[in-house]
């Protein structure tokens, strides 16, 4: 097994939550440290606080992957007598690197908002606000029948074959005869130089977002047995890869608002929420934006949702919600902590595929600043 460095782990993060999905001005990525350093232990956290850094030091963590960037606002100087300054000093002293995936993880398929929607058992989910589009591509690879599985895995393990949020590893296979004549300088896996060879082959096809072209073609070339594999990639005119903020979906059946709030508190492991609207209403269609969704209340209303879930609802926004008749549950910003276990599982899965040796843990520090008295 290989001890990978920080760059190799951030490459995995790029597959999970591509940087280009981030909202404009969001300071994602490296926060502090050295990504070239070998990584033997990774810790996932919602927030980077001094208590979290102390935990990382105690547990000998090399890389912290956070949801919220702690260098969110421009820093003109670092005063090591302040709480943040002390934290940065500790990170540098103990050679701990910090990396953040924020709105890109909120927006990505399978990211924060999908996790929250899944915990509520929402069905037929779609995005609330489209924020990114690009073309889909299709790849067609011609491979000997006995090598089909290795090439198929190279495709699906690198992002090809996903259709929507509920279908993965979608490929299409057709059989035929492949013919080729190796030149004098060739090193053919099958056949002889200067001799026409014809063998049964399988054409395997899958779609993928355009941004994954280089990653997928590189992986296929590594997995393919041929010296010069036949690979076709073309842009699809009829399909577009879309990503967006928030999710809206439906519950299996209509329930009362009070019952839904109880269900939500259990799903998100919280004791209290704030509510705006009519508690006597019924709920089936639900819109949710993890974190601060104040700017998107009209988009949430336009979905036809019976209730909107978000965090950090402002006083005047609450009046606006009453005015547009959109019942809203303020479940707090801290519900985004669900990303810790999700990223741990995804990283373990990818590290196993890549044969990386490391330990993955989630922070046990409660970073919610609020108490209810």
Swiss-Prot record:
- The question of whether Metal-binding is a record keyword is answered with yes
Q: Which cysteines are joined by disulfide bonds?
A: none
Residues binding a divalent metal cation 1: 67, 106, 336
Taxonomically, which superkingdom?
Bacteria
**GO cellular component annotations of the record:** cytoplasm
Please give the organism: Listeria innocua serovar 6a (strain ATCC BAA-680 / CLIP 11262)
Keyword terms of this UniProt record: Metal-binding
Pfam families in UniProt: DUF34_NIF3
For molecular function, the Gene Ontology terms on record are: metal ion binding
Keyword NAD among record annotations: no
Where does this protein hold a divalent metal cation 2? 68, 333, 336
Q: What is this protein called?
A: GTP cyclohydrolase 1 type 2 homolog
Q: How does it assemble?
A: Homohexamer.
Q: Which family does it belong to?
A: Belongs to the GTP cyclohydrolase I type 2/NIF3 family.
